[in-house]
Each structure stands twice: as C-alpha cells, then as structure tokens.
Amino acid sequence: MRKTVIVSAARTPFGKFGGVLKEVKAAELGGIVMKEALQQAGVSGDDVEGNVMGMVVQAGSGQIPSRQAARLAGMPWSVPSETLNKVCASGLRAVTLCDQMIRAQDADILVAGGMESMSNIPYAVPAGRWGARMGDGELRDLMVYDGLTCAFDEVHMAVHGNTAAKEYAISRREQDEWALRSHARAAKAADEGKFQDEIVPVNWIGRKGKPNVVDKDEAIRRDTSLDQLAKLAPIYASDGSITAGNAPGVNDGAGAFVLMSEEKAAELGKRPLATILGFSTTGMPAHELAAAPGFAINKLLKKNGLTVQDIDLFEVNEAFASVVLTCEKIVGFDLEKVNVNGGAIALGHPIGASGARILMTLVYELKRRGGGLGVAAICSGAAQGDAVLVQVH
C-alpha cells in the first residue's frame, strides 16, 4: 500500500485569548500557514489537489473557512476544500483524512491542518430568530458552549478532567508539577530556538494602522512556581484538582502541512520530513475524555506490531495535565519521552489547531535527534481519542 509523507509543516505563534492575534481571523491565520507550508515544500497552489483544515467553532466566520484560507494562501478556485470539526482532534484528523485519501490513490498532493481564533468566536442569542416574547433572553458564549462543553453531560471539559484525576488517583500536586514542567520546558525550547523551524511570523496592520509582527508563542509563563500554582482555586468543581494553572489557556493559532504520496515526493525530488505509518481513533463514554488518547495509543501500537518501548517520543496534547498523567497510567510510557519541549499548558490550545501543532512539534524534534518513531495523540470533546504514528529518517 502507498505511504503518505509529510513534506513541510508550519504554524503561527499561538496567541493568548484577547492577545496579540485577537484582530486576526481564523481563516487569515490558516491562509498564512498554508502559504508558508507550500513555500517550504516548493510547490504552488496549482499543484495541490485539495485541502482539509480543522476548525471547531465556525459560527460567524462565513461559509467554509478552509476555502477562505486556501484562497488567501494563493490556491486557485479549482482546488476543492473541506472544513472539518472533530473538536480538539480536528487538526490531527485533517491530516489522517488526507493520509487516507493519498493511500487510496485519490490524490498525490494535499494540504492539511487546523486553525482557530478563539478570541473571535461570537456570542449568540438563541431566541433571536423567532423572538423571546416575554422575559429575559440568553446571550450564549459559543466558545464555551460549542467548543468547551460536553453536549451529553452538559458540563465543562474540566469536569471530565477532574473525573479522570480521581479515577486514576492523580493528585493535585502531580498535576501542578506537570504544568510547571510544561512551562519550564517550553521556555527552554523557545530560548534555544527549537520552535523556529515550525513558526512562521504573523504580520498584520492594527486598527490604527500600526504594523505588528508576532513571532513567539505568547502564553509561556517563565515566572510561575509550584507555590503559585498551588494557590489557584479549582475550576468548575469545588472539590476538584483542575485549575487555571494546570490547564491550557484559550488561544488563537493555526498550523498546516503539505502531504504527498511517497512516489510523488520522489518524483519531485522532495526530501520528506516524516512518513505517516498509521493512525487510530477510539471512542469512550463522554466522562472518560482524558483516557481516550491513552487507549488510542495502545490501539495504534497493537495495530502496527509495536510496543511502547519502540517509540522514541510522544506528544500528548495537554488538554489538562490530568490527560497526560492518565495516559501514562494506561500506556505505561516513560514521561521523559513525552512533550519534551513543553505542551499546550504552556504553548496554548487553539482547539482546531492543536492536533496539527503536536504533530509538527513531534516531527521537528525527531528530526533534531536524528530520526526515530513518534506518536502524537489528542483527546476531543465527547471522549474520542486520535493517535498518529510517524517515522523520521
């Protein structure tokens, strides 16, 4: 069977909620990274046979944001586009969907990734269509309602993160220690220039005509400590252990890849960054959200005849610190192999883009280390898990 290779990968810096990227729409962020990925790959928009971009909350963004992004990236009208929503797994699922298309010989060159501007997600008035008639009306925050709330249990994702911490006996201190590690490692990686390979600067003109350049992740906290983290109150559950400190922020950002069939890359003389060897997905009861990536990883390893010891590096999205620590209990991986340059707690979690970010961070780190096998895994709302296996030569 044919194999898919990653030829290029680029992402924006991740901005804080209402931060440096608040005036840049999701499709604009997507256009920036798609254009950069094409330039890195040395192919034009005319060469692309399709694109798939993940985006979770599309309300108010206009029709098919992925096609808007593709046009901004210079792709012609003839290139078809899809916008995909698998909650936090959207950016990773966009890649695996394109992998399936390439392996099925439906395409040879595709662009995949994810984007989200959580700062630009609107509020909605549910009764506005037909009228509230009498009494107060509701102003609904679509970022929370469509992006961060379980549609089945009607609770914030943090509640399910708390459930996992209790079930798997993960202490508040362990979660805070992981959060501190995430910030420390991300700060060190940033200082050493490790994110320069993946980050493309965002240039934009502010409302007052002032040019702005954003080239660094905004959310890394260099000054945090265990004492500071320990003082934070639990969120969404008074007896819980999830806090604003051991959970990621609300962020803006995008990431994209150029994917090719192995044969097409060879024909064009392209040296791949990585080869996609397989992927897996899993679904669980909604409250078991944090465990889903762990079971997806185990399923992926079994499917490919591998053990956890065969994998050189893991990237597990830090939807909460409890997610990584729950997966450690399920998979049994060495935590020293996980999120070695920090994770979403420090870098940010723009929900539609995070799956793309963890995969490219994994690939570039394996490349720096001279190659190896890596797994990127992520949970998503309603307790689904996605995992991807890559090899860097």
Curated annotation (Swiss-Prot):
Entry GO CC: cytoplasm
Expression triggers: Subject to catabolite repression.
Gene Ontology molecular functions: acetyl-CoA C-acetyltransferase activity
Entry superkingdom: Bacteria
Main location: cytoplasm
EC code(s) of this entry: 2.3.1.9
InterPro entries, per database record: Thiolase (IPR002155), Thiolase-like (IPR016039), Thiolase_acyl_enz_int_AS (IPR020615), Thiolase_AS (IPR020610), Thiolase_C (IPR020617), Thiolase_CS (IPR020613), Thiolase_N (IPR020616)
Catalytic reaction equation(s): 2 acetyl-CoA = acetoacetyl-CoA + CoA
GO biological process terms, semicolon-separated: sporulation resulting in formation of a cellular spore
Location(s), subcellular: Cytoplasm
Enzyme class: transferase
Annotated keywords: Acyltransferase, Cytoplasm, Sporulation, Transferase
Active site: 88 (acyl-thioester intermediate), 349 (proton acceptor), 379 (proton acceptor)
Family, similarity comment: Belongs to the thiolase-like superfamily. Thiolase family.
Protein name listed in UniProt: Acetyl-CoA acetyltransferase
Organism encoding this protein: Bacillus subtilis (strain 168)
